[in-house]
Protein backbone atom coordinates (compact mmCIF):
# COMPACT_ATOMS: atom_id res chain seq x y z
CA UNK A 1 0.00 0.00 0.00
CA UNK A 2 1.26 3.49 -0.90
CA UNK A 3 0.84 5.39 2.36
CA UNK A 4 1.66 8.81 0.92
CA UNK A 5 -0.92 8.77 -1.88
CA UNK A 6 -4.24 10.60 -2.24
CA UNK A 7 -6.42 7.58 -1.38
CA UNK A 8 -4.87 7.22 2.05
CA UNK A 9 -4.89 11.00 2.56
CA UNK A 10 -8.61 11.23 1.86
CA UNK A 11 -9.33 8.47 4.37
CA UNK A 12 -7.09 10.01 7.03
CA UNK A 13 -8.64 13.44 6.57
CA UNK A 14 -12.13 11.93 6.77
CA UNK A 15 -11.21 10.23 10.03
CA UNK A 16 -9.70 13.40 11.48
CA UNK A 17 -12.84 15.35 10.54
CA UNK A 18 -15.00 12.65 12.14
CA UNK A 19 -12.81 12.79 15.23
CA UNK A 20 -13.26 16.54 15.59
CA UNK A 21 -17.01 16.26 14.96
CA UNK A 22 -17.31 13.57 17.64
CA UNK A 23 -15.36 15.68 20.11
CA UNK A 24 -17.78 18.56 19.56
CA UNK A 25 -20.89 16.36 19.70
CA UNK A 26 -19.72 14.74 22.93
CA UNK A 27 -18.87 18.08 24.54
CA UNK A 28 -22.33 19.38 23.57
CA UNK A 29 -23.96 16.28 25.05
CA UNK A 30 -21.97 16.42 28.29
CA UNK A 31 -22.44 20.15 28.88
CA UNK A 32 -25.95 20.54 27.37
CA UNK A 33 -24.71 23.71 25.67
CA UNK A 34 -26.77 24.52 22.59
CA UNK A 35 -24.19 27.02 21.28
CA UNK A 36 -21.67 24.21 20.73
CA UNK A 37 -21.77 22.86 17.18
CA UNK A 38 -19.84 21.33 14.28
CA UNK A 39 -20.55 22.68 10.81
CA UNK A 40 -20.06 20.88 7.50
CA UNK A 41 -18.10 23.14 5.17
CA UNK A 42 -16.68 22.29 1.73
CA UNK A 43 -15.85 18.68 2.58
CA UNK A 44 -14.57 19.49 6.06
CA UNK A 45 -15.73 20.14 9.61
CA UNK A 46 -15.67 23.43 11.51
CA UNK A 47 -15.68 23.12 15.31
CA UNK A 48 -17.30 25.86 17.39
CA UNK A 49 -17.21 25.31 21.15
CA UNK A 50 -16.00 27.55 23.97
CA UNK A 51 -13.90 30.54 22.92
CA UNK A 52 -11.70 29.99 26.00
CA UNK A 53 -10.48 26.73 24.44
CA UNK A 54 -8.66 28.51 21.61
CA UNK A 55 -7.96 26.67 18.36
CA UNK A 56 -7.87 23.14 19.83
CA UNK A 57 -11.66 22.83 19.79
CA UNK A 58 -12.33 25.81 17.53
CA UNK A 59 -10.80 25.13 14.13
CA UNK A 60 -11.52 23.65 10.70
CA UNK A 61 -10.14 20.41 9.28
CA UNK A 62 -10.75 18.48 6.06
CA UNK A 63 -11.57 21.59 4.05
CA UNK A 64 -11.42 21.00 0.29
CA UNK A 65 -11.16 17.23 0.48
CA UNK A 66 -13.17 16.23 -2.57
CA UNK A 67 -15.28 19.39 -2.49
CA UNK A 68 -14.76 22.79 -4.08
CA UNK A 69 -14.08 25.72 -1.76
CA UNK A 70 -16.02 28.93 -2.41
CA UNK A 71 -15.75 32.50 -1.19
CA UNK A 72 -19.36 32.34 -0.02
CA UNK A 73 -18.74 29.30 2.19
CA UNK A 74 -15.62 30.81 3.76
CA UNK A 75 -17.41 34.13 4.34
CA UNK A 76 -20.12 32.28 6.29
CA UNK A 77 -17.39 30.51 8.25
CA UNK A 78 -15.71 33.80 9.11
CA UNK A 79 -19.04 35.21 10.31
CA UNK A 80 -19.58 32.22 12.62
CA UNK A 81 -16.14 32.48 14.20
CA UNK A 82 -16.24 36.27 14.31
CA UNK A 83 -19.51 36.21 16.24
CA UNK A 84 -17.67 34.28 18.96
CA UNK A 85 -14.62 36.53 18.96
CA UNK A 86 -12.40 33.86 17.38
CA UNK A 87 -9.78 33.88 14.65
CA UNK A 88 -10.42 31.42 11.82
CA UNK A 89 -7.82 28.63 11.74
CA UNK A 90 -7.99 26.02 8.98
CA UNK A 91 -5.77 22.92 8.74
CA UNK A 92 -5.22 22.30 5.02
CA UNK A 93 -4.09 18.95 3.59
CA UNK A 94 -1.79 19.10 0.52
CA UNK A 95 -4.29 16.80 -1.25
CA UNK A 96 -7.12 19.34 -0.97
CA UNK A 97 -8.63 20.62 -4.22
CA UNK A 98 -6.73 23.54 -5.84
CA UNK A 99 -9.49 26.05 -5.09
CA UNK A 100 -8.74 25.69 -1.37
CA UNK A 101 -5.48 27.63 -1.30
CA UNK A 102 -6.62 30.00 -4.04
CA UNK A 103 -9.72 31.13 -2.15
CA UNK A 104 -7.99 31.34 1.23
CA UNK A 105 -5.10 33.34 -0.21
CA UNK A 106 -7.48 35.79 -1.87
CA UNK A 107 -9.27 36.25 1.44
CA UNK A 108 -6.08 37.15 3.29
CA UNK A 109 -5.24 33.90 5.07
CA UNK A 110 -1.61 33.29 6.06
CA UNK A 111 0.23 30.18 7.25
CA UNK A 112 1.04 30.27 10.96
CA UNK A 113 1.87 26.63 11.79
CA UNK A 114 2.38 23.11 10.44
CA UNK A 115 1.39 19.66 11.68
CA UNK A 116 2.34 16.16 10.58
CA UNK A 117 -0.09 13.34 9.90
CA UNK A 118 1.45 9.91 10.45
CA UNK A 119 0.06 6.56 9.33
CA UNK A 120 0.93 2.92 9.94
CA UNK A 121 -0.35 -0.28 8.41
CA UNK A 122 -1.45 -2.85 10.97
CA UNK A 123 -0.54 -6.53 10.86
CA UNK A 124 -1.52 -9.59 12.87
CA UNK A 125 1.81 -9.62 14.71
CA UNK A 126 0.96 -6.22 16.23
CA UNK A 127 -1.38 -8.11 18.55
CA UNK A 128 1.44 -10.21 19.98
CA UNK A 129 3.43 -7.34 21.53
CA UNK A 130 3.72 -7.38 25.34
CA UNK A 131 4.87 -4.46 27.54
CA UNK A 132 8.31 -4.55 29.20
CA UNK A 133 8.67 -6.01 32.68
CA UNK A 134 7.30 -3.69 35.34
CA UNK A 135 4.90 -1.86 33.02
CA UNK A 136 1.26 -2.92 32.89
CA UNK A 137 -1.37 -1.64 30.46
CA UNK A 138 -5.00 -1.33 31.53
CA UNK A 139 -7.79 -0.16 29.24
CA UNK A 140 -11.52 0.17 28.70
CA UNK A 141 -13.63 -0.59 31.76
CA UNK A 142 -10.50 -1.14 33.83
CA UNK A 143 -9.80 2.61 33.64
CA UNK A 144 -12.51 4.65 35.37
CA UNK A 145 -13.51 8.00 33.91
CA UNK A 146 -12.38 9.87 37.02
CA UNK A 147 -9.00 8.13 37.00
CA UNK A 148 -8.39 8.83 33.33
CA UNK A 149 -9.46 12.47 33.55
CA UNK A 150 -7.45 13.28 36.69
CA UNK A 151 -4.23 11.67 35.46
CA UNK A 152 -4.54 13.05 31.92
CA UNK A 153 -5.03 16.59 33.20
CA UNK A 154 -2.24 16.34 35.77
CA UNK A 155 0.28 15.08 33.21
CA UNK A 156 -0.60 17.69 30.59
CA UNK A 157 -0.51 20.48 33.20
CA UNK A 158 3.10 19.59 34.00
CA UNK A 159 4.24 20.31 30.43
CA UNK A 160 6.43 23.32 29.70
CA UNK A 161 3.60 25.22 27.99
CA UNK A 162 0.37 23.77 29.39
CA UNK A 163 -3.01 24.53 27.89
CA UNK A 164 -5.77 25.98 30.10
CA UNK A 165 -6.98 23.51 32.72
CA UNK A 166 -10.59 23.85 31.54
CA UNK A 167 -9.55 22.70 28.06
CA UNK A 168 -7.50 19.79 29.41
CA UNK A 169 -10.45 18.67 31.50
CA UNK A 170 -12.83 19.00 28.55
CA UNK A 171 -10.58 16.93 26.26
CA UNK A 172 -10.20 14.17 28.85
CA UNK A 173 -13.91 14.08 29.71
CA UNK A 174 -14.75 13.94 26.00
CA UNK A 175 -12.38 11.02 25.40
CA UNK A 176 -13.76 9.10 28.38
CA UNK A 177 -17.37 9.69 27.32
CA UNK A 178 -17.09 8.78 23.62
CA UNK A 179 -18.50 5.40 22.65
CA UNK A 180 -15.96 5.02 19.82
CA UNK A 181 -12.99 5.67 22.09
CA UNK A 182 -11.00 3.44 24.43
CA UNK A 183 -8.96 4.94 27.26
CA UNK A 184 -5.61 3.42 28.27
CA UNK A 185 -3.34 3.79 31.28
CA UNK A 186 0.21 2.55 31.78
CA UNK A 187 1.28 1.66 35.30
CA UNK A 188 4.87 1.33 36.45
CA UNK A 189 5.45 -0.51 39.71
CA UNK A 190 1.76 -0.13 40.49
CA UNK A 191 1.54 3.62 39.89
CA UNK A 192 -0.13 5.27 36.88
CA UNK A 193 2.64 6.74 34.75
CA UNK A 194 0.74 7.83 31.64
CA UNK A 195 -2.58 7.77 29.81
CA UNK A 196 -3.77 7.80 26.21
CA UNK A 197 -6.83 7.36 24.00
CA UNK A 198 -7.75 5.52 20.79
CA UNK A 199 -10.79 6.27 18.62
CA UNK A 200 -11.90 3.78 15.96
CA UNK A 201 -13.71 5.21 12.93
CA UNK A 202 -14.90 3.97 9.56
CA UNK A 203 -13.31 5.06 6.28
CA UNK A 204 -13.34 3.98 2.60
CA UNK A 205 -10.22 1.93 3.42
CA UNK A 206 -11.76 0.14 6.39
CA UNK A 207 -11.63 0.97 10.07
CA UNK A 208 -8.87 3.35 11.16
CA UNK A 209 -7.62 3.83 14.71
CA UNK A 210 -6.81 7.44 15.56
CA UNK A 211 -4.39 7.68 18.49
CA UNK A 212 -4.61 10.83 20.60
CA UNK A 213 -4.61 12.51 24.06
CA UNK A 214 -1.37 10.84 25.16
CA UNK A 215 0.48 12.18 28.20
CA UNK A 216 3.04 11.04 30.77
CA UNK A 217 3.50 12.22 34.35
CA UNK A 218 6.69 14.26 34.76
CA UNK A 219 8.24 11.73 37.16
CA UNK A 220 8.05 8.98 34.53
CA UNK A 221 9.17 10.80 31.39
CA UNK A 222 12.09 9.36 29.49
CA UNK A 223 11.21 5.80 30.51
CA UNK A 224 9.41 4.68 27.36
CA UNK A 225 5.87 5.02 28.71
CA UNK A 226 4.39 6.64 25.61
CA UNK A 227 6.09 4.17 23.29
CA UNK A 228 4.51 1.33 25.27
CA UNK A 229 1.11 3.06 25.14
CA UNK A 230 1.42 3.40 21.37
CA UNK A 231 2.23 -0.29 21.01
CA UNK A 232 -0.69 -1.25 23.27
CA UNK A 233 -3.10 0.82 21.20
CA UNK A 234 -1.79 -0.67 17.95
CA UNK A 235 -2.47 -4.12 19.37
CA UNK A 236 -5.99 -3.13 20.40
CA UNK A 237 -6.59 -1.53 17.02
CA UNK A 238 -5.64 -4.69 15.17
CA UNK A 239 -7.86 -6.76 17.44
CA UNK A 240 -10.70 -4.35 16.63
CA UNK A 241 -10.24 -5.03 12.91
CA UNK A 242 -8.47 -1.81 11.96
CA UNK A 243 -6.28 -1.77 8.86
CA UNK A 244 -4.51 1.52 9.58
CA UNK A 245 -3.61 3.71 12.55
CA UNK A 246 -3.02 7.46 12.49
CA UNK A 247 -1.47 10.10 14.72
CA UNK A 248 -1.17 13.86 14.25
CA UNK A 249 1.70 15.74 15.89
CA UNK A 250 3.66 18.93 15.59
CA UNK A 251 7.03 18.38 13.97
CA UNK A 252 10.13 17.90 16.11
CA UNK A 253 8.32 17.18 19.38
CA UNK A 254 8.50 14.09 21.58
CA UNK A 255 5.22 12.71 20.20
CA UNK A 256 6.60 12.80 16.67
CA UNK A 257 9.74 10.92 17.71
CA UNK A 258 7.79 8.23 19.58
CA UNK A 259 5.48 7.88 16.59
CA UNK A 260 8.33 7.22 14.18
CA UNK A 261 9.98 4.77 16.59
CA UNK A 262 6.72 2.78 16.60
CA UNK A 263 6.86 2.32 12.82
CA UNK A 264 4.62 5.16 11.65
CA UNK A 265 5.42 6.97 8.41
CA UNK A 266 4.83 10.59 7.58
CA UNK A 267 1.84 10.63 5.24
CA UNK A 268 1.80 14.40 4.71
CA UNK A 269 2.31 17.75 6.41
CA UNK A 270 -0.61 20.12 6.81
CA UNK A 271 -0.45 23.89 6.94
CA UNK A 272 -2.60 25.84 9.37
CA UNK A 273 -3.95 28.90 7.58
CA UNK A 274 -5.24 31.66 9.81
CA UNK A 275 -7.18 34.87 9.35
CA UNK A 276 -7.18 37.09 12.45
CA UNK A 277 -10.49 38.37 13.72
CA UNK A 278 -11.13 41.87 12.39
CA UNK A 279 -11.77 44.01 15.45
CA UNK A 280 -13.75 47.27 15.22
CA UNK A 281 -10.60 49.31 15.90
CA UNK A 282 -8.83 47.55 13.01
CA UNK A 283 -11.42 48.71 10.50
CA UNK A 284 -10.86 52.41 11.24
Give the role of each language-model region.
Residues 84-93, 237-250:
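Conserved GNAT acetyl-CoA-binding A-motif
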Residues 51-59, 112, 201-211, 221:
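A conserved beta-turn-beta hairpin within the catalytic core of GNAT-like acetyltransferases
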Residues 1-82, 97:
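N-terminal charged segments
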Residues 162-219:
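A conserved beta-strand-loop-helix scaffold within acyl/acetyltransferase catalytic domains
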Residues 30-37, 85-86, 112-114, 173-184, ...:
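A short helix-loop-beta-strand connector motif used in the catalytic cores of GNAT acetyltransferases and
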Residues 66-146, 255, 271-275:
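Acyl-donor-binding surface of acyltransferase catalytic domains
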Residues 1-23, 61, 115, 124-172, ...:
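Short amphipathic alpha-helix that is part of the acyltransferase structural core
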Residues 70-79, 212, 216, 222-239, ...:
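Conserved acetyl-CoA-binding loop-helix of GNAT-fold acetyltransferases
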Amino acid sequence: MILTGPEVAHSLELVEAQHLAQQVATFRSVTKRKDVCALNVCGGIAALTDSAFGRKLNHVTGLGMGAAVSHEAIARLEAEYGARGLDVEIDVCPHAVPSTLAVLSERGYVTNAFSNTYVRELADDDVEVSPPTGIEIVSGGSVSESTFVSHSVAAFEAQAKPRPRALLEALAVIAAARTDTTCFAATLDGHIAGTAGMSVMASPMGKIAHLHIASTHAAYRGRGIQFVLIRARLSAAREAGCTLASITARAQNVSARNTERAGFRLAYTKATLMKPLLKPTDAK
